[in-house]
Design a protein with these regions (language model features):
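His/Asp/Glu-rich acidic catalytic environments and adjacent acidic regulatory segments
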Residues: 1-142, 157, 161
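Extended, domain-scale alpha-helical bundle/helix-rich regions
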Residues: 146-162
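Conserved small/polar residues in nucleotide/adenosyl-binding loops
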Residues: 164-168
Length: 168
């Protein structure tokens, strides 16, 4: 790239870096702010003692009674793996998978839209029709058509096997 195009590329990548950082910071803040506080010992059914002790310690640190589970892996994974209470697992799962989508200061929707638009602008500036075409060019697939061809081959190969497993 030369001249204005080069300057535009610099501006876009600078904005992309800032937006990516903002996205990550929002994700971290939302993760840090969430807590599932349980006060009924029956709700801990199925959890290993180590997870219960860690949740009790987290509750003490936060100055609350009971047990606190967070979206951080050392708390989240044991809860999702071992907790008997399906409703509580669902609550924690939904909290984890809807981070930064709520109507609050950590919502990443606009950031994601801006990142997608910048990706498109960068791709077009470099002579590609879209960002997927740009990113695939340097990879094994090289084109979107090649990706779809591979996916269809996998589908053809694995569909009969999957039906066999369904009938078991």
């Amino acid at each position: 790239l030369q001249g204005e195009a080069k300057e535009k590329y610099r501006e876009l990548t600078k904005n992309l870096s800032k937006l990516t950082l903002d996205f990550s910071e929002n994700n971290l803040k939302e993760t840090n702010n969430y807590q599932l506080t349980l006060t009924d010992e029956a709700q801990l059914a199925g959890l290993p003692e180590s997870a219960i002790e860690a949740a009790a310690e987290t509750a003490r640190e936060k100055g609350v009674n009971g047990w606190v589970f967070t979206l951080h892996a050392p708390s989240y994974i044991p809860f999702m793996t071992y907790a008997d209470n399906r409703d509580l697992r669902r609550e924690l799962y939904m909290a984890y998978n809807t981070k930064c989508t709520h109507d609050n200061e950590y919502n990443n929707l606009e950031i994601v839209k801006k990142i997608a638009n910048i990706h498109m602008e960068i791709a077009q500036l470099l002579g590609y029709d879209n960002y997927a075409e740009y990113t695939l060019k340097e990879r094994m697939a090289e084109t979107g058509d090649a990706v779809y061809k591979l996916l269809n081959q996998l589908l053809d190969a694995y569909t009969p096997v999957s039906y066999t497993h369904l009938t078991l």
